[in-house]
Amino acid sequence: MSMSTVPARIEPVAPLAPQAQDLRCFNTLGLASHAPAFVALTEPSQLPALSALAPRFRQLVVLGGGSNVVLPASIDGLVAQVRLPGVRLVGQCADAWVVEAAAGENWHGFVTVCVDNGWDGLENLALIPGTVGAAPVQNIGAYGVELADRFHSLTAWDVKGGRWVEMGAAECRFAYRDSFFKHQEPGAWVIGSVRFALPRPWQPVLDYPDLQRHAALDGAAPTARAVYDAVCAIRRAKLPDPAVVGNAGSFFKNPLVDAGTRQALLGRFPGLVSYPQPDGRYKLAAGWLIDQCGWKGRQLGAAGVHDRQALVLVNRGGAQAHDIMALAAAIQGDVERRYGVRLEPEPVVVPAR
């Protein structure tokens, strides 16, 4: 793989002193979890110290906003939360703005800053929970736009190699809710900052009917602000606030199937919801599959399925990782038995050791 090493900056190494930390408030599912060794990364100069510290532990768990993880009751290892701050415009040309955000920035806050400054192109991704640094790992996407569509490059710390590395789209190997980072040893990389190429002139992406209805209520040509407001309104209406009901957003990926499989399923289930993809495959609506299996609003122990969005698993109070995963497994089994399709979880399931 071709990656460019960023020249080392001459700066003092900031020390890291691990401390015990309750992680219940550090994951949006609100799962009870304890880290005997926890550090917060607030400046890039701390990364060499992390490389020196990590080998002393069984595993290194890198956390962002905790919105896409299932944490165990106790983590045997070092937990490092990325809190690196900063947003700046680093360049512009005739066809794009190039904007850089540090990995610890809140994703929705960053999108809002872009819309406020006229750096349009990320508005379809508004209100997705988490941090900027976690966004490329998952290749987040919503309402017809994926992070990969707006990606320029990123800088990541190679924990074992002890160096900063610059990576472009080819090196990141983006796919549907997937990237190079999801196939590496956990804790091998810490993303430091991400740069985005935001198109000029801007064109709205209104592929979803809900978005079309919300963004053009007045009949005028939609603006980026109107699309942003519409996305926020739709998400708030459909998805629970993690501050009120513990959840990790969409828990399952929408499965991809070939045209033949989709046609066979349509013959048996005429109401099947699917979306054509550029490669000829079809993306099935996982929420529809789960709903049709009767799971919407149901509960299994302390874990449940949200009553308005079947893709969202929620903590009904006191749930632990095993409760969430037992519910997920039951849903997967029912969907596979009925439709012959295996649902894949989106969140990273962190092992206890």
Swiss-Prot record:
Major site of localization recorded for this protein: cytoplasm
MF (Gene Ontology): FAD binding; UDP-N-acetylmuramate dehydrogenase activity
Annotated source species: Bordetella bronchiseptica (strain ATCC BAA-588 / NCTC 13252 / RB50)
Record-given protein name: UDP-N-acetylenolpyruvoylglucosamine reductase
Alphabetized HAMAP family for the sequence: MurB
Sequence ranges assigned to domain FAD-binding PCMH-type in this UniProt record: 31-201
GO biological process assignments: cell division; cell wall organization; peptidoglycan biosynthetic process; regulation of cell shape
Pathway: Cell wall biogenesis; peptidoglycan biosynthesis
Enzyme class: oxidoreductase
EC number: 1.3.1.98
Keyword Plastid annotated: no
Localisation per UniProt entry: Cytoplasm
Gene Ontology cellular component list: cytosol
Cofactor annotation: FAD
Active site (UniProt): R177, S250, E346
Keyword vocabulary terms for this entry: Cell cycle, Cell division, Cell shape, Cell wall biogenesis/degradation, Cytoplasm, FAD, Flavoprotein, NADP, Oxidoreductase, Peptidoglycan synthesis
